[in-house]
Amino acid sequence: MIDIKELKFDEKGLIPAIVQDYYTKQVLMLAYMNEESLKLTLEKGETYFFSRSRGKIWHKGETSGNTQKVKKIFYDCDEDALLIQVEAKGPACHTGNISCFYRSFDEETEDGIEILNKLYERIKGRKINPVEGSYTNYLFEKGIDKILKKVGEEATEVVIASKNDSKDEIVYEVSDLIYHLMVLLVEKNITLNDIYNELERRYKK
């Protein structure tokens, strides 16, 4: 393990820290650390950064609740940059996006994991801030029995589509099932990271 003193902080005593989702490997944000904030991160197990604009240390998620539990910290070959893998509790970006890097120079389609994360956050947002006429809010208003009924119905539709052997139909019905499963997860306050954790546990067996 490297001694913090061996890291190459810049002339202002800072080192760039790239934050990456431990499970999805999506890059979440870029921030800066000084020696003290890095020590706090190692000690507390959550990310602490140094704000260049405010000139002080800040704890990620202190006000928003979107904390980042540290899983691993890497440093590069030149010892002048950090890669921090985290288990994120909520979006990393102040805009509400999962990642601060949500804009692109081109129009390429987002990857599947990002779409799932955004869908989950959208459903969660509907529960917190209901929108009149929203089907998602209708499910939350009707409660757990209605949600479970829909999950069961959609699972049956997947079985039927699979028996019909139509790829388009299977994709459509599985998408419906995933959506309703996410509604169930939000209702039960279960995050996608909880699911990623379990899948990782099984993968390592």
From Swiss-Prot:
EC number, as in UniProt: 3.5.4.19, 3.6.1.31
Catalytic function, reaction form: 1-(5-phospho-beta-D-ribosyl)-ATP + H2O = 1-(5-phospho-beta-D-ribosyl)-5'-AMP + diphosphate + H(+); 1-(5-phospho-beta-D-ribosyl)-5'-AMP + H2O = 1-(5-phospho-beta-D-ribosyl)-5-[(5-phospho-beta-D-ribosylamino)methylideneamino]imidazole-4-carboxamide
Protein's cellular compartments: Cytoplasm
Pfam annotation, one family: PRA-PH
Any one GO CC term of the record: cytoplasm
Keyword Chloroplast: no
Main localisation: cytoplasm
Keywords: Amino-acid biosynthesis, ATP-binding, Cytoplasm, Histidine biosynthesis, Hydrolase, Multifunctional enzyme, Nucleotide-binding
Pathway as given in its UniProt record: Amino-acid biosynthesis; L-histidine biosynthesis; L-histidine from 5-phospho-alpha-D-ribose 1-diphosphate: step 2/9; Amino-acid biosynthesis; L-histidine biosynthesis; L-histidine from 5-phospho-alpha-D-ribose 1-diphosphate: step 3/9
Keyword Signal: no
GO biological process per UniProt: L-histidine biosynthetic process
GO molecular function: ATP binding; phosphoribosyl-AMP cyclohydrolase activity; phosphoribosyl-ATP diphosphatase activity
Superkingdom: Bacteria
HAMAP family: HisE, HisI, HisIE
Name of the featured protein: Histidine biosynthesis bifunctional protein HisIE
Organism: Caldanaerobacter subterraneus subsp. tengcongensis (strain DSM 15242 / JCM 11007 / NBRC 100824 / MB4)
High-level lineage: Bacteria, Bacillati, Bacillota, Clostridia, Thermoanaerobacterales
